[in-house]
From Swiss-Prot:
Cross-referenced InterPro entries: EGR_N (IPR021849), Znf_C2H2_sf (IPR036236), Znf_C2H2_type (IPR013087)
Record's keyword terms, sorted: DNA-binding, Metal-binding, Nucleus, Repeat, Transcription, Transcription regulation, Zinc, Zinc-finger
Gene Ontology molecular function: DNA-binding transcription activator activity, RNA polymerase II-specific; sequence-specific DNA binding; sequence-specific double-stranded DNA binding; zinc ion binding
Zinc finger (C2H2-type) stretch: 275-299, 305-327, 333-355
Basic and acidic residues composition bias: residue spans: 269-283
Entry protein name: Early growth response protein 3
Gene3D superfamilies xref list: Classic Zinc Finger (3.30.160.60)
GO CC, alphabetical: nucleoplasm; synapse
Chain spans, region Disordered: 241-283, 348-387
Regions of compositional bias (Basic residues) in chain numbering: 350-360
Source organism of the structure: Mus musculus
Known function: Probable transcription factor involved in muscle spindle development.
Annotated family: Belongs to the EGR C2H2-type zinc-finger protein family.
Domain of life where this protein originates: Eukaryota
Length: 387
């Protein structure tokens, strides 16, 4: 069955229904559609309704005077009598009187045609008749009990329906915890202690949590430990002034692999290298304090220079500089012989040795043929004669 929307018609509901002929529907109603087969009085009553204006029937089943117009507000009749109309429209195929298959009698009002004031008041009163009383709705659907908190909402196990027919999985209300109590007036009651400047031997005495309090600026931003202060701490056992009365724990220096040439003489004399490495088993000495600082990072494992691209850390700034070139692709060092570029100077130096070896080989090959091509002096045989 198909339905189409009708075009906008400048007519009202009552005028649309008045144009329908009286003999539109036959008196014989099929048994499938006959709702009142047992009572002839009821059928006669509805047959009488077919010849009258549907919109002109009041609540008391009395025909009003046609000259009277509908008022803006519909007054209910005494006795609280209501009339309920039941009907069914079924179209198997397009009929002769309705080629467009208009199946809704309310199409004149739905399509947006402004109805007359009388028709508007009639539709409003009809809608109020269809709505059930509020008392019947409350009797059919009882009010929900009030809940004091969210925990009372799940007082019974919650089950989920399975469309395949399996029994539902029940969840006990213990799985759903009640609402958490509100926080007290203290915004940060407990915070963990993430102190990164304690020695591993003192970790047992540090509590896991402590009440929120003002942080010491020295703990937040500890002063940097210079290599000279580190050496003094090893030699003189002095206490660092920035940490108050707490003794400064000894700096753990990791052993490193032995030097390849431990007894190799240095170009700088010994008296010009006053800064010795304090690590046990390390005999390195340096002429400048920054060189000792850089060397101590090998023992401590401190890597303060971090790449912002891959977050890799380095102990020396020059190592970070050459590492960043791997990301940027910069190659500032060019070979003097072939023009090939490198990111590190030691790579260029290693590459230059190849050209030097090739040059030496060419010079050796060039000197060998010159020696062989030298003229050979042949001595003539000496002939002696006897007199």
């Amino acid at each position: 069955m198909t339905g189409k929307l009708a075009e906008k018609l400048p007519v009202t509901m009552s005028s649309l229904l008045n144009q329908l002929p009286d003999n539109l529907y036959p008196e014989e109603i099929p048994s499938a559609l006959n709702l009142f087969s047992g009572s002839s009085d009821s059928v006669a009553h509805y047959n009488q309704m077919a010849t009258e204006n549907v919109m002109d029937i009041g609540l008391t089943n009395e025909k009003p005077n046609p000259e009277l117009s509908y008022s803006s507000s519909f007054q209910p009749a005494p006795g609280n009598k209501t009339v309920t109309y039941l009907g069914k429209f079924a179209f198997d195929s397009p009929s002769n009187w309705c080629q467009d298959n208009i199946i809704s009698l309310m199409s004149a009002g739905i399509l947006g045609v402004p109805p007359a004031s009388g028709a508007l008041s009639t539709q409003t009163s009809t809608a109020s008749m269809v709505q059930p009383p509020q008392g019947d709705v409350e009797a059919m659907y009882p009010a929900l009990p009030p809940y004091s908190n969210c925990g009372d909402l799940y007082s019974e196990p919650v089950s989920f329906h399975d469309p395949q027919g399996n029994p539902g999985l029940a969840y006990s209300p213990q799985d759903y915890q009640s609402a958490k109590p509100a926080l007290d007036s203290n915004l940060f009651p407990m915070i963990p202690d993430y102190n990164l400047y304690h020695h591993p031997n003192d970790m047992g005495s540090i509590p896991e949590h402590k009440p929120f309090q003002g942080m010491d600026p020295i703990r937040v931003n500890p002063p940097p430990i210079t290599p000279l202060e580190t050496i003094k701490a090893f030699k003189d056992k002095q206490i660092h002034p920035g940490f108050g009365s707490l003794p400064q724990p000894p700096l753990t220096l990791k052993p490193i692999r032995p030097r390849k040439y431990p007894n190799r003489p240095s170009k700088t004399p010994l008296h010009e290298r006053p800064h010795a490495c304090p690590a046990e088993g390390c005999d390195r000495r340096f002429s400048r304090s920054d060189e000792l600082t850089r060397h101590l990072r090998i023992h401590t494992g401190h890597k303060p220079f971090q790449c912002r691209i891959c977050m890799r850390s380095f102990s020396r700034s020059d190592h970070l500089t050459t590492h960043i070139r791997t990301h940027t692709g910069e190659k500032p060092f060019a070979c003097e012989f072939c023009g090939r570029k490198f990111a590190r100077s030691d790579e260029r130096k290693r590459h230059a040795k190849i050209h030097l070896k090739q040059k030496e080989k060419k010079s050796e090959k060039g000197g060998a043929p010159s020696a062989s091509s030298a003229p050979t002096v042949s001595l003539a045989p000496v002939v002696t004669t006897c007199a």
